[in-house]
Structure formats: structure tokens, C-alpha cells
Amino acid sequence: MLTQYNLKMPHAVYGGENAMDNITAIIKARGAKKVAMFTDKGIEGAGLFALPEEAVKASGAEYYVLDELPPEPSYMAVQKLVDEFKTSGADLIVACGGGSVMDAAKLASVLVTDDYGVKELLDNPGMAQKCLPIVLIPTTAGTGAEVTPNAIVAVPEKELKVGIVNENMIADYVILDARMIKNLPRKIAAATGVDALAHCIECFTGNKANPFSDLYALEGLDLILNNIEKACDDPDAMAEKNRMQIAAYYGGLAITASGTTAVHALSYPLGGKYHIAHGVSNAILLAPVMRFNSEHPAVKERLAVAYDRCCHENETCTTVDEKAAWMIARLEAIVKHLDIPTSLKEFGVPAEDLEGLVESGMQVQRLLVNNMRPVTADDARKLYQEIM
């Protein structure tokens, strides 16, 4: 555990019934005259963009829509959108979407000038300076991008996803309106929900875990383990969906305070090269990596603590070993229940790509150094072999 730690978060978070209405007041309070609205075609097609659009209209401000962002975008695709954004003349940003949309908007908020671009931030994220206020509206209960200082982009030439991290990208305002996730397709709800699960359990068992991250990681883990199945299975389970939305936010706060570990590190090549959805790649690796990590005594102890906090039913586990094993089995059960693939074979990943995966995965030292149990290239090889 770190001896020094800090937590920075958005200026204000609005949740509950009709939370979207707060956008109107935010725009007026900031004196914004023109709003850049980031979204994507899928959000528009699902009818989800109408709510924030109406709230922006009610403010009387002009607005400009930027919706040409592909799924799992490369840094070049994000730069193209940022270049369009620069022509809008906007003085405030509103982003409505999943992690990719929110990350693109966060990057835009620090790229108003021509001093540097996304590629330069990949090499030197510290140069990013806050330029515009930003409002983030998540349409999934998973990524936590609405609260983190991170922006994840694909780097095709490295066949990797890379995180750009700078606290100047933390949102000013977050809107958690459960109406945005009510009709989320089960497949997407499942993948993003398990992404949030990975955030919480990785942050709780990482080297940088601290009282701030523990607070949010444990509460998020409790909410997810006891609500994710019903939230995904039942379109009308609004109480459970709302809890998942809050849990995803807590997971993002945990990332901000500590950070993810080997699950995310080893998943980045799966998205970067094979375009496997981020939540799915994390789900495939979640139980294998946590089982590997549980051989470290401190991780095993923390998994037992998580069991004591999150297991509300009359389970019979009494020892640390039993509790840690139960937690890992619970992770596997959730992934199975949600019908998420558990092997790379289902995505056509050939066995001969193994060494390339190992090489790429070991490059993500930003996250691997946070893993309590050190991960060697041989360890990574065995973990990838397990999911082949």
C-alpha cells in the first residue's frame, strides 16, 4: 500500500431522476454560447442522444454535433474528430456515449490549440493543459471514463491500446441518468459491467491500493457482485441498473486513486490487434489473472476481505484460502452467466500469435508495475496460453 495518495474527481456529479436537466443550468452558469456535443451513430440510432440534446437546446446555446467516431478508435481517428471540433468555435463540451466517446471528448478538451496533438500526448501526456469545461454522460455502466483522467486509444503500428493519463482531463461535470442505460443491449451491458468489475477488483488488489481507492473499489465491487446479473437480464430492473451505474462511477474513482493491473495490461493487445471489445477482453482474462495473483499472500488476503464485504448470503467459507477461491469462482460464474466468451479461439486468434501477444502485453509496464505479483514474460505466456 502506498504511503502517500490522493484523489481528484469531477467538480460536480448529478444523479437520480431527470439528472439530465442539470445540463441546462450548467451551460447557463458557465456562460457558454456554443456547445460541442460528442456522441456516435449508435447512440443517435438508439435514440439516446435526444435527452442531452434537448437539455442543451433549453439553455439557448448553439451546438455542434460530432458523431464520426468508430468503435475502439485509433489515435488517428480521434485526431480527425478533434480537428473537426477545433472548427466549431465551442466554449463548452458535452459528451454522451461509452468510453471511446468520452475519452475522445476529454482529449478534445485539452487540444483546443495547435501546440500538440493526440500523437504527441502519447509520447508526453504531461503536456496536456485544460482548455475547456466538459460534461460527461455515460451510456453504459462500466467504463468509468466519466471520472478518470485517462483516455485510451488504439495505436495500430504497435497493435496496442495505450492510455494517455493527465489529471487535466478529469471532467468538470458528470451526469448519471439511469434512462441512458435502461435499454442497453444485454451484450453491451454485460461486457461493460464486467469491465467495471475488473476495475474494482484490480484496484483493490494492486500495489497502489490506498484508503481512497479501497473505499470506492469495495463499495463498487459489492454493488456489482450483487446486481450485475439482474441488471443485464431484466430490462425493467431499474434499481439494479442504477446501482451498476453508480458502481461503474466508483470503479472509475478507484482507478483515479490507484489504477488497474495485469488484467487490463494483458487485455490491451487483444483490443489493439484483434479489435476485441475492451470489456470482453478483460472478461476473458479476469479469472485467470486473479487466480494467478491469488498466489501472492497479500492478494489472497484482500480477496478474503472482499468476500467478507460482498458476500451477503449464507456462504460457508471460513478460511482465507476458501474465501479467495470463492471470489475467483464468482468471477467465472458471472462471465459464464452473461454469455461472454472465455477463450480467444472464439475470435479466431491463431496459436502462432502467442509470442506477439506476450511481447505486446509486456510493454504495458504502466499497469504491470501495479500488479502485486510480478508478471514475467513467461507468466504472461502461460496466461495467454490458458485463454487460447
Predicted regions and their residues:
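An N-terminal, well-structured beta->alpha segment
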Residues: M1-L66
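Carboxylate- and glycine-rich phosphate/diphosphate-binding segment that chelates Mg2+/Mn2+
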Residues: N150-S258, M372
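Short, amphipathic C-terminal "tail helix"
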Residues: P350-M388
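Glycine/threonine-rich beta-strand-loop-alpha-helix active-site module
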Residues: M76-A178
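Gly/Pro-rich interdomain helix-loop hinge
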Residues: K273-D353
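Glycine-rich phosphate/pyrophosphate-binding beta-alpha loops
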Residues: G142, Y249-N282, Q365-L367
